[in-house]
Amino acid sequence: MAATRTAREVVELYNLVVWNQCNLALAEELFADNVIRHEVGEARTLTREQAVNRVREIWELFDKLRFDLNVVIADDDGEHVAIVYDSTMTTKDGTETKIASIEVFRVVDGSIIEVWNCGYQQGVWN
């Protein structure tokens, strides 16, 4: 039996492979049956299919999309991982936009079950 991925491995794969390479098969592996996405003022529960479709639908808007993880902090509890990222998104007409944010993930048994996102802003971290 294959070893379960660590929470840090899952979060890095999610950002660097699922998002950067639009690897939807891996996304299906990394999401739990249900994923709670927390934002300020609301939380939404997505099924695995909805979570994968979210990646697909965002990728359909862009020709290129890249996340760079500036900071990755894995908590000692083995479940929580915080990331600080910059992202460059290029539309099909060549327009490039840079955004930055911080997210916190909760990973249980190798699957993403919760994500906290405070929103993002245009620009990059200094």
Predicted feature locations:
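Short beta-strand segments enriched in hydrophobic/aromatic residues
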Residues: F31, S87-M89, E103, G119
